[in-house]
Amino acid sequence: YQHSKEEKSDFQLEAAADMGALMIDGLTDGIWLMNNGDIPAQTIDETAFGILQAARLRTSKTEYISCPGCGRTLYDLRETIAKIKEATKHLKGLKIGIMGCIVNGPGEMADADYGYVGAGPNKVSLYRKQVCVEKNIPQEVAVEHLLALIDADKK
């Protein structure tokens, strides 16, 4: 599909809207994007792979599930999401849930491979699938504990 967009976000939105529905409905299983604007080839490739992953046709990167945070979130959710993404972006095929609280977190991340869920003021619990494997970890070291859990499971 060919686009004529100058802005990355406009290109991504239009490409996803045009191609995503066809893929979800099973009418195609591949994608070729082109752009007549100034969008770099790397962005075009990343967009195509992102659409394929969203349609569950090809996994090419780590996937993250997160809540927007609310009054029950007792740690810096945005900063934590950024830290976890940076530390795990190379783990192709994993799905990691990052949730603000214990109330809705475990249910919202039910299909994640690993979960990072707020447990109290600056405390976090870690999950493997839907099973809590470590409780009330201080937030300052919780990302390292998550990475250690993932590494231990690789062995």
What does each model-identified segment do?
Residues 103-111, 120:
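A C-terminal functional module that forms or caps the active site or interfaces directly
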Residues 1-91, 95-98:
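Catalytic alpha/beta core domains of metabolic enzymes, predominantly
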Residues 22, 67, 101, 109, ...:
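Conserved, mostly hydrophobic/aromatic
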Residues 38-39, 103, 140:
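Short, surface-exposed acidic/glycine-rich loop or hinge patches that mediate macromolecular interfaces
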Residues 121-127, 132-154:
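Beta-strand/loop-dominated core regions that host nucleotide or nucleotide-derived cofactor-binding catalytic loops
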Residues 5, 103-104, 128, 137:
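Domain-level signal for soluble alpha/beta catalytic cores
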Residues 17, 106-107, 131, 137:
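Solvent-exposed, flexible loop/coil residues
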Residues 115-116:
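Short, well-ordered beta-strand core segments
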